[in-house]
Amino acid sequence: MIFQSFLLGNLVSLCMKIINSVVVVGLYYGFLTTFSIGPSYLFLLRALVMEEGTEKKVSATTGFITGQLMMFISIYYAPLHLALGRPHTITVLALPYLLFHFFWNNHKHFFDYGSTTRNSMRNLSIQCVFLNNLIFQLFNHFILPSSMLARLVNIYLFRCNNKILFVTSGFVGWLIGHILFMKWLGLVLVWIRQNHSIRSNKYIRSNKYLVLELRNSMARIFSILLFITCVYYLGRIPSPILTKKLKEASKTEERVESEEERDVEIETASEMKGTKQEQEGSTEEDPYPSPSLFSEEGWDPDKIDETEEIRVNGKDKIKDKFHSHLTETGYNNINTSNSPIYDYQDSYLNNNNTGNLENLKLQLLDKKNENQDLFWFQKPLVSLLFDYNRWNRPFRYIKNNRFEQAVRTEMSQYFFDTCKSDGKQRISFTYPPSLSTFWKMIKRKIPLLSLQKTLPNELDTQWVSTNKEKSNNLNKEFLNRLEILAKESLSMDILETRTRLCNDDTKKEYVPKMYDPLLNGPYRGTIKKGVSSSIINNTLLENWEKRVRLNRIHTIFLPNMDYQEFEQKAYTIDKKPLSTEIDEFLTLINELGNEPKSSLNLKGLSLFSDQEQRRVNSEKRTKFVKFVFNAIDPNETKSGKKSIGIKEISKKVPRWSHKLITELDQQMGEFQDRASIDHQLRSRKAKRVVIFTDNNATNDPEEEVALISYSQQSDFRRGIIKGSMRAQRRKTFISKLFQANVHSPLFVDRITPLRLFSFDISELIKPIFRNWTGKEGEFKILESREEQTKREEKKEKDKKEDNKRKEQARIAIEEAWDNIPFAQIIRGYMLITQSILRKYILLPSLIIAKNLGRMLFLQLPEWSEDLQEWNREMQIKCTYNGVQLSETEFPKDWLRDGIQIKILFPFCLKPWHISKLYPSRGELMKKQKQKDDFCFLTVWGMEAELPFGSPRKRPSFFEPIFKELEKKIGKLKKKYFLTLKIFKGKTKLFRRVSKETKKWFIKSIGFLKKIKKELSKVNPIVLFRFKEISESNETKKEKDYLISNQIINESFSQIESGNWPNSSLIETKMKDLTDRTSTIKNQIERITKDKKKVTPEIDINPNKTNNIKKLESPKKFFQILQRRNTRVIWKFHYFLKLFIQRLYIDLFLSIINIPRITTQLFLESTNKLIEKFISNNEINQEKITNKKKIHFIFISTIKKSLYNISKKNSHIFCDLSYLSQAYVFYKLSQTQVINLSKFRSVLQYNTTSCFLKTKIKDYFKTLGIFHSELKHKKLQSYRINQWKNWLRWHYQYDLSQIRWSRLMPKKWRTKVNQSCMAKNKNRNLNKWNSYEKDQLIHYKKENDSELYSLSNQKDNFKKCYRYGLLAYKSINYENKSDSFFSRLPFQVKKNLEISYNSNTSKHNFVDMPGNLHINNYLRKVNILDIERNLDRKYFDWKIIHFSLRQKGDIEAWVKIDTNSNPNTKIGINNYQIIDKIEKKGVFYLTTHQNPEKTQKNSKKVFFDWMGMNEKIFNRPILNLEFWFFPEFVLLYNVYKIKPWIIPSKFLLFNLNTNENVIQNKNQKQNFFLPSNKKIKNRSQETKEPPSQRERGSDIENKGNLSPVFSKHQTDLEKDYVESDTKKGQNKKQYKSNTEAELDLFLKRYLLFQLRWNDALNKRMLENIKVYCLLLRLINPTKITISSIQRREMSLDIMLIQANLPLTDLMKKGVLIIEPIRLSVKHNGQFIMYQTIGISLVHKSKHQTNQRYREQRYVDKKNFDEFILQPQTQRINTEKTHFDLLVPENILWSRRRRELRIRSFFNSLNWNVVDRNSVFCNETNVKNWSQFLGERKPLYKDKKKLIKFKFFLWPNYRLEDLACMNRYWFDTNNGSRFSILRIHMYPRLKIN
């Protein structure tokens, strides 16, 4: 068995090896390429089909195979690949050959005249067949294009080692495939010939010569196919001759530019020259080739080779220059005057005045331009046919006004090559292409062995070792610092200090940060100072040295140079003495630096010392000198004249050699210097519309005010350069005339949904359900506000869409007129013809006809009235865009640009004119409408509202006549029928009465007695009572159902609609309520009536005798039964309806009652719990006088929200983060025995974070907290993908102002946001409370339906406080150290009413939405001045006060001016009793104001403190649909904040009482001044704030149980008292709200912008149009008055004065002030805090936020006793906590970056799982505790925090990432951050 399995295993492995072998893969790819059919197959097929002899077949097959072999070889051999893949190859060779072949096949006899020999090889046709098959293999394939195959082959080629074997096997596979293919083809052809059924075909038999004709015309068929191929390729490849040549930028500009660039940096690329002359220019100027060959432009090798070719094909080739002088005799024969290198430079050498250089260059350029005209045909053929500098591809030209030419976009940013890094060969994708080319050239010239000798590995090893050593040193230093810190040493030397450059030691003045090189690196700028002669000499010397070396290198790389020969001649001098010779020679040059070069006498110079001269003979000396002079460029002398300094490092960007202008630029008259040049860019179709011309200077076109009107048509050619190809778009089509994007037909159904198949199921079901229940009326009534608004919105939407459709149609017509040639001329003439016809022929003839008709009907003619109206009609000529001119004046160039004719007061023929004595109201309205009436004339003489609009309906002439006739006929008919009716009725009645009355009277007397008897048996009272009761029950149920549903719908609609207009909010709501109540009443009445009809009742009426008859006579019983049956069948439908209705009501009532019962139980249990806790705590509290049952104010909301959940299927609550903590706590408090340890994490996080376990979820499900959908939604575990989770749960990148106060470790960070009430407020508070109490009690008497009364604000707050205390205690029941609630708020100690720390506490009752994004308006001002802002006022949740609506709906912020109720004062702790005024809203903003200052008529203005341009005062701003306890949600959805931070009062500080604002006004000027206090050695981290020390000492001195307050807080208290009690003597009194708002705005925002109102914009444009018309008129007064009457001109805009104050402009609504969205330049600290602050979300917010704050412990027995921690270790531990959460902060930034990069280079552990083990292994984390030096209770929280810190790169900064990104990945833009795969560096090992 073992042997068998062994064999089997071997077999499998052998098979796998065979399958994966190179040969098999090659064969596979070869077989695949068989199916790529190209044009060459046509020739092969033709040779096989045409039976032209075996020679042709053989030659075709041979050519076919040879061509494919060439293609395969080209895959491996790069030069061949380049040669075949070049665009010139196909352009120059293949296309002409194709055309020639086409001509050859069609004119065969032309070549057949002299062929007599029978030698097959000399026969031209056989060679042609071979060539055809060979050449057409190089063409692209038609079927199964081989691009995919080629890519696969390339990928495999890149992977496999044995490339030649792979290519060979690929070719063999291809060969086998093609042999099989050809054999199969042969067999098919033979079968066709031999098949009898094909030959005996009726059609073929009837056409005897069909096969012969087919065979004869086969050549023609193939030639047609080839011609199609030819056209296809012409379409793909740009024709070299037909494409448009672009005029290049002026040569002189380029020349100067390139000169400057060469001086800046030798290695940068000079401008790419497009044509030969430019190349000549560069070679003549430089004795070495232009460095653009080696430029870092990311070229592919094709482009480099092209430039080589162009350079090689030049007129004077550099190789010839050098080759002619480097002869075997050495340098003896050199003569500078004859040398082409110095042909224009010797005059410069022999000239003392170097200033003639520029003139000389210009002369040379002129000469060159002359030569260019003469010898244009000397251009090389390749660059003529294929100019790579031309825009052949459809590139967009990106215009850049700052530079001369556009940047080339197709240059790749990446270039792959191998390089050595860390001593290993690696592939780099940012390898400089110039270096790669350079290295290839070196390899070509120098033998590989000598290269390998010169490149030892010592350098690499040395580099690696030094890098390791440096990183180890850094690590050691870092660890040493950490260890010292761990020992709790307080010396400040631990932190690495940052050295600053100091100006003055005594004053300690530092250089500004910007210019400090120690902070910002060297300042890169030119140092403009006088240069000493020694510096000039040194730089000259350096430049000479450089140029010697440079030219020496360039001579190596000149084409076709015999390197060995050159080396022999050059190095005939001994190498050792040569170095000394060079040294001495250079010192000599240095001495002679200042002398003119012409005075150098080369023959008489003694270059060397005497000793050296003995060794070196004279021949060697002269040889050396001439070699040096040949290498040195004498041109270098000019460097002495240039300013010496640090040049700015810049990379040369590849640019096009053309500067192009658009059609629009040409039209607008820009680029006047190039006015003669035609535009090269296709721009969007546009028209220049002149709206105003200055009459004084009509000739000057610049005085015209013009607009550009763009065409609406989709133009995909826009921005494409003329002559360039169009993009080859596949699978796209343009179906409409105007289409924004091109779409693939594949997605047509996505773009326009098919009407047949699109339907909404819910919409279909609704009517069925309604019919089934039979409650259509109720459905209509109960249709919520939401649905009503939806319907209205749909109507509006349809209307808008209709208008949009009309507008599109109008634009389409306009575009059509624009596009058709000569259309405007035709249209113009047609319009003028129509206007003349209308005015002088059509209308007068109509007037005549009408009046003649009137005369015929004996009516008075109305000549005067009609003629008056006809005269009133004005036909004004307008420009194409509708700007009015006058009746006689035609617009400029109207035949070309177009014309419109506007008809003012268009004439309308009326059958009669109404008497002017008594006009009706309707006629008056019509007249008013006609005043504004105007229209535009269409081409067909119709009237349109807008130019090119659809013709409008004119009032019919005959319609009023017919109406009048109808009225008269109707009146006559009425009269006639009335008389007839009366006459008939009277006669009938008289006859009938006489007969009937007699009979009926006699019978009725007999039955009266019987009825009496029957009634005495039955008790009628019982029957009636029973009926009444059942009916009343029914109606009650109905009412209940209706009202309950009504409430729900109403609340939803009111909450959800967030954009009601500000002004009429209250009125609309009132109106809605009244409407709704009335409709409900009507509906109930109607339902009761319907029921009466529906239920069949026995009518027991003693007056009627029918029933008695029926009961008495047994004969008629059967008939009665029959009738009853039919009636039952007839009314069964109604019975069914009634039954369903009952069922429906009962179900709904039961559902509605469930939440009521549950909430009652719910609240009772919580009351018991809370009272139990409170009773324990009452010992240390003050005696609370007003003991009552706690009524929570959110009961009504619970009802509603619970019902909403049941109604909405709770799909919203699948995300755990939507559950408010208050709700969770309530649910938990209901359960009797509960294990709270499981839920501590849940209850403490603001979002139920990724740490939530599944068992907790299951437990919650059993408790009924979560719903069943959550069961399947497993949250990702924390370890799977930390990065994703981290981002998912910490997405709040915008820092709010309050988070600033939390994060920045400054003085104000330690302040506790505490609301300190002033002493004098106690009295006012009591007064106000009593007043409110009276009001509430009074109101409660009036309306008993109010659920709960808020009798006392103080008591309510106490309740909420107890609730919060209980919540916190139960959550932190294990961890007593975490408790922060010290005692009840209203214990009077030092008159401070609230003493808990609102900044450190986590309020369960302030639960903000976690998913709202804010626009962050952070400014430098706020950051600098935040300390002062915090000193002003604090705003916590107690400012927002509660009030209950009757139905408990939360609705809006309601603005109440104080003049609405003179008794309602606005004070600190006063909630407005809004219910009395109107039953709206729960939360009301109150403002701080002195009671003395509150006057009866004063108005309060709430300022929108976030700076958002939203008017929030009179409309609802939050959708509370998701919240269970909305009373505890801050009603501000824009300002997002963490739940444990309370917004402070400075956000809503009062305008009138804030003295700080006014006092600080003068100080704000100093915001941007640098502070004078400088510290010489500044620590990287901020030092311990002074406030902390003060507070620490303060605590130590006190030592009692009083709450901890810093000195700042006591100051704050004073500030409160002062600001509130002072009279308003220093306060600025504002005249109006606008002024106050403006003033505050200017204080808040130093920078702002003024924005026009949008509505004003439109009115402005209308005004401008009218002004344009008025300017042209001679007597404009009449038109002015009429235009004002028609409201075409707005006088309020005309009255805007230049010197109007800003407040007036704001009042008028002309200007809107809004803050500028500044991109504030933040320093590194800000970015660090923004990045790191996100990860600081932690369980113990208390500790995270207040690291410097004293921890407090709470005794187990008594929660409210406050015990202080011993003070010994406090300062040290807390300081280290902050620094060591980010241990790297010890080092300063540059060293930190170095540490990271070095650690990165040496990191060996790349495995992701291992790297993340940091987060899972607790022992690793625990190692850090020795650095933290903290107490044990803190440790458990810090551990997780450290985990967070090491979760990312520790304290990584954004700028570091950006730097590393650029450094490693060569990305120069931020969009490629996705490339980043940053590896966290390995953990530091602690010994």
Curated annotation (Swiss-Prot):
Do the record's keywords include Signal?
Answer: no
Q: What GO biological process, any one, is recorded here?
A: protein transport
**Region of interest (Disordered), residue spans:** 248-300, 785-805, 1569-1603
User: Which residue ranges traverse the bilayer?
Assistant: 18-38, 64-84, 87-107, 124-144, 172-192, 221-241
Q: Which Pfam families match?
A: Ycf1 (PF05758)
Q: Which domain of life is it from?
A: Eukaryota
Keywords from UniProt, A to Z, are: Chloroplast, Membrane, Plastid, Plastid inner membrane, Protein transport, Transmembrane, Transmembrane helix, Transport
GO CC field: chloroplast inner membrane
Q: Where is the composition biased (Acidic residues)?
A: 256-268
- Compositional bias annotation for Basic and acidic residues: 1578-1597
The membrane topology of this protein is: Multi-pass membrane protein
Subcellular location per UniProt equals: Plastid, Chloroplast inner membrane
Q: Which InterPro entries match?
A: TIC214
- Coarse class of the protein's main subcellular location: plastid
Subunit structure, per the record? Part of the Tic complex.
Q: What does the record give as the function of this protein? A: Involved in protein precursor import into chloroplasts. May be part of an intermediate translocation complex acting as a protein-conducting channel at the inner envelope.
Similarity comment: family membership:
Belongs to the TIC214 family.
Q: What protein is this chain from?
A: Protein TIC 214
Q: What gene name is listed for this protein?
A: TIC214
